[in-house]
Structures are given as C-alpha cells and as structure tokens.
Amino acid sequence: MTSPEASAIPFEPKKILAQLPHMPGVYRYYDTAGAVLYVGKARDLKKRVSSYFTKTQLSPRIAMMVTRIARIETTVTRSEAEALLLENNLIKALAPRYNILFRDDKSYPYLKLTAHRFPRMAYYRGSVDKQNQYFGPFPSAWAVRESIQILQRVFQLRTCEDSVFNNRTRPCLLHQIGRCTAPCVGAISDEDYAVDVSNAARFLLGRQSEVMKELEQKMHAFAAELKFEQAAAVRNQMSSLATVLHQQAIEVGSDSDVDILAVVAQGGRVCVNLAMVRGGRHLGDKAYFPTHVESALTLAEGGLGEEVEPAEAVDATADAPVDTVADQPAEEAGSARGAASAASVEAEVLDAFIAQHYLGNRVPPVLVVSHAPASRDLLELLSEQAGHKVSLVRQPQGQRRAWLSMAEQNARLALARLLSEQGSQQARTRALADTLSYDSDDLATLRIECFDISHTMGEATQASCVVYHHHKMQSSEYRRYNITGITPGDDYAAMRQVLTRRYEKMVEQAAQAAAVDEAAGIDGESTRQAEASSLLPNIVLIDGGKGQVEIARQVFTELGLDTSMLVGVAKGEGRKVGLETLVFADGRAPLELGKESAALMLVAQIRDEAHRFAITGMRAKRAKARQTSRLEELEGVGAKRRQRLLARFGGLRGVVAASVEELASVEGISHALAEQIYKQLH
C-alpha cells in the first residue's frame, strides 16, 4: 500500500467543493479550535463532502455541526478498502465527537504457553509475538483463568514464573495437590512434559476427542507392559478430561472459532455483545457500550450515512431476502421505513465495532451477526488482513442460532443494567470495571481492597486495608496492621509485609480446601473452595506509584496470585485530586483518566478512605507509644506498677493530672514514690 496523498485546504466551501476529486478517500472536519468533529470515508470524495453543504433539509444537529466546520482535510486513497482502513485508524487516534467510538481494548487477554524448555502456562495481555504460543483472544480474564484451571487439572502444566522455577529445590503445593508435575525438580521427563504441552494445545484448539483417543491408547500400552502405576495415572488424566468435556457438553459445537455479535439499541444507548467460541467451547461474552452514538446516529438519520453496499451475509441455508419499501402500501411502507431506520442505527454501530475491534487484530473465520453490516468493503478488508475468508452469518441455524439468541438477550440485560446504574454509585463501579477490563454479570460481587502506609518520620508505622464490596465501603471488614521489624520510614518494606500477612493465609486456606476436596475425590470447585476463593479480592489498589506496585507484584508472584489485579494510584502534580495516574503490575501502560472520570472518582473515594483509616490508626498508635514511653521512663515504676497506674487513671493524661495523694492510693505506690512520680511528670 502506497502512502495516500493528503491535503489541507483553507475553509471556503465553494472553492473546496470545486477542488475535490471524484476519487475514494477520507475526509476530516475541524472546528475553529482545531478539534476534529468528524472523520468519514467516501468512494467519491467530491459527491460525499458536497452533500453536507448542498443538501437543504439537514437535521438541527447536523446543521449545527456544519456551521462549526472551520477546516476540511482530505486524504485520497487508491481504493475504498484503503480508505476504510485509514478511516478506522483516524477515528481511534482522534476520537471525533460525531463518530461512533468504542473504547480501544488493546489488552485483550490470551492464554500463553512460553517457549521455555518446560513451557509455562500463563494469563497474558498485550501484543503477541512469534516466539511463544498464544490461544485466544478470550472475552474476559475469567475465561482465561478457567481454562488455566482446566489445563492444570488435566495436564498439570506449570504456572510459576521462570525466576521461581529456576530456584526451586522441592516441589510446590500445586504438585502436592495434583495440579503440577513438578518439572522444576525433575519429577517428569522432558519428553513426557512435551507430550502434556502438545495435548493441552490441541485441547485449546478444539481437538479434545483426538487427545482422548491418544490417552486411551497410551493407557492400554502401559497396561500391556505391566506398568500399572503409569496406566493408572493416564486413566486419572482421562477421567479428569472426561469430566471437563461432560461439564462443557452444552457449550461444545461443531465450530472451532466463531465470534457472535449482537447489537441492541434502547434509551439512547447502544450495546454490542461479543460472545466468543474458541476450540468449539463457548467462552462467555463481553458487553461494549460505544460513545458519541447520539451525534453519529443523527448523521445517519439525517440522510448522511455512508454510501455503502450492504455486506453479504451467508450461512448453510439461504438468508431471507432484503426487505424493500417501494412496492408496499403506504402504511406498510412507513412502518418499513421506521424499521429500516432502526436497522441502520444498529448496522452503523456494528460497522464501527467490526472496524475498530478487528482491523489490526486476529479475526475468526466466522462472524455471526444480529444485523447485516452496512459495508461490503469491510468484509473484504478483514479477509485480506486475516489471510483467509471471513464469512458473515446473518440468519444462523442450529447451535449458532442459540448462541446468537443468547448474545442478544445478554446485550439487552447489559443495556438495561447500564441504564439503571447511570448517575449512581453503581455507575462508578461500572466505569471502574470497564476501565480495568473487569468482567462480571453482577458488579455487586466486585471486591476491591486498598492499602495505605502511614507513619510520622518512621514512627508508629501502620498499614491500613479498606474494603469496597456491594457498591459501598464495608467498614466492618477494615483492618489495620502494625508494621514491625523494618527500617523506620521504609514504605516498600512496610507494603511487602502487609501484603504478605494479608494474603498468605488466604492462599493457604484455598490450597487446603483444594487438597481436602482432592483427597475426597471431589471434581470441580466445591462450596469449600468457593468460600476460600471468595475471600480474595478482584482488584487491589495500592496507594503509590511504580515502586510500590513492583513490591506488590513481587509478593503476588511469590504467593502465586494474579498480578493483573494490582493497580497503583500514583499522585499527580502537586498531589491535586483528579490528576492521579493508574499504574499496573502486568505491563499495561499507565492510565490517566481525568477529573471528570467516574472511575477515578471511585478510585479516589476508596484511596481517601484507606488514607483516613491509616492516619487515624497511626495517630492513635503514636499517642499510645508516647504515653507508654513516658511512664516507662519513670524511676521506681516497673511493669506491674505501670499497669496499675494506667488501670486507675485511664492513661498518661490521667496519671499526669493526679495529685500526690491520688497516686499514693494506688496499690504498690508509697507516699514517697508518689512524690517522686509527681516530680518526674511535672
């Protein structure tokens, strides 16, 4: 693809229209401040741009946009496909007010098998490379972790980081509960581990029956050689795999990789629900809510939608023909026009989603859609980019139809939930969940814990942990931790200590629950395991920047916890509220949300509560320490007499205010000692 020809023309509408070519390309409208208003593509730039200035019946909002245009830039391209690609890139980069815009989720989760001698299985976000194996993308972090748990149970691949793997001298707890074959200590050969890795990869690719057949052959071979222990191990592996396949029976279809896209519009908002099928397994879905929809759809309703040919939808059975309006009676024609208008809204949104979500990313061979996208060029460009034909299925049958129906229902539910949450604390929770790519059907279950360290010049160091759950702060679950055994003022050591103390026991409880279930022959997650796992938070906020987050990452790695839940809250310039930056432990780029962000409002609320709780605890501890230290300095007053004085007068202040006679009335305090105490305190 050659570089397109670009031009910037001073804004004089008549001159601009006269100079525009009858060629495909992209146009951009700017206001007087230089802010981009709209980005569009056209197969004929002259006709398309002229329509904004020559059409007499424009809607008020379109007319308002046209009056704000102060500059037009155009870029000529060789083809409509090239224009489509450039348009998508510009929309992502410029976020124009009048374009439909989806949040750019560059950190879609994958399951990664590393290129190590003993490959590690890991949750991964970010760009993929050719060195490691990647499976996905997955619709949510939960789907990745569920797959990892399945592979641990069936194939027992390692999940520890290489730094931990290289320094192990004995098997970890995962080996003891049958979740890892302990290659770190040579408990399995290179060849056998490689077979497990190959089987796991084929399982993820949807070739489960092939894996099961090979395991059965392997079991019989061991039995024929009288290697009954090895045969029993393979039998157990087959049993675990059979259990998994049985649990997923309703999810598995003949398709290997399919994406299902359902679009629903209601109450001025639009939801696109994306469901993913990978390796024949339905992995769940994710709801997307585009911004700038109202402005963009006003353009479409005003007759200025893009000049496109509908994309052709295909399936094993023929689709219903496209409805027309011309040959219908007047009343039916009016109704059909209304339906067509509504359909165009969803088609425009679907076009925007497909372009912004798939261009530049992996595309499955089949997209099942609730509405036919407006642009055929888009489908052709996706196929060219993917290196294989990408088919759109508009009216699916069988299992695909059930998947689409479920996606549409989930889109309606997600949209209804969003509308009910707007303007409330639930809206803040939703905003934070979307910002951090946390997926859950019930945000009330979202548990956030936040940590803060407080001290005065290294004195009375104390850490606080506050909890946000069910859309509110849970004060009964707040905890304070006295930090000891560190260099005064060492916040990093304090953070390491509190995180270790907080989560080490939780990890042990979860492991013990799994071990008990394993011994009892219970497959899957029991109530015992669920209760142990529910104690762990979904998001952990750290009041601090990169240094504190790195310490937290080290602790979580040592404990085997997911580092993607760690979020640092770094203070902005001058420590002003609204200028904070979110720092991540899993390699994601730092994020600045801005003062008006509902997500940042919730983060600040939780962070400030942690700070308040830490400060009050630190002050109380410091005051108590200072009181105790003054009494400890009194000559002739040991531990027992000190306790009696505190019990009688309630603290240092009461002892200081007491007279000699009152001091002498305390058991074990003579009149002479009372006078001595009085003189030392005054």
From Swiss-Prot:
InterPro entries from the UniProt entry: GIY-YIG_endonuc, GIY-YIG_endonuc_sf, GIY-YIG_UvrC_Cho, Hlx-hairpin-Hlx_DNA-bd_motif, RuvA_2-like, UVR_dom, UVR_dom_sf, UvrABC_protein_C
GO BP terms, alphabetized: nucleotide-excision repair; SOS response
Domain UVR, residue spans: 209-244
Domain of life per record: Bacteria
Alphabetized PROSITE patterns for the sequence: GIY_YIG (PS50164), UVR (PS50151), UVRC (PS50165)
Keywords of the record: Cytoplasm, DNA damage, DNA excision, DNA repair, Excision nuclease, SOS response
UniProt GO molecular function: DNA binding; excinuclease ABC activity
Matching Pfam families: GIY-YIG (PF01541), HHH_5 (PF14520), UVR (PF02151), UvrC_RNaseH (PF22920), UvrC_RNaseH_dom (PF08459)
A Gene Ontology term for the protein's cellular component: excinuclease repair complex
Gene3D superfamilies recorded: 5' to 3' exonuclease, C-terminal subdomain, GIY-YIG endonuclease, UVR domain, UvrC, RNAse H endonuclease domain
Subcellular location: Cytoplasm
Keyword Nucleus: no
Residues of the GIY-YIG domain: 22-100
Function: The UvrABC repair system catalyzes the recognition and processing of DNA lesions. UvrC both incises the 5' and 3' sides of the lesion. The N-terminal half is responsible for the 3' incision and the C-terminal half is responsible for the 5' incision.
Matches recorded under HAMAP family: UvrC
Family: Belongs to the UvrC family.
Quaternary structure (record): Interacts with UvrB in an incision complex.
Protein name: UvrABC system protein C
Source organism of this protein record: Burkholderia orbicola (strain MC0-3)
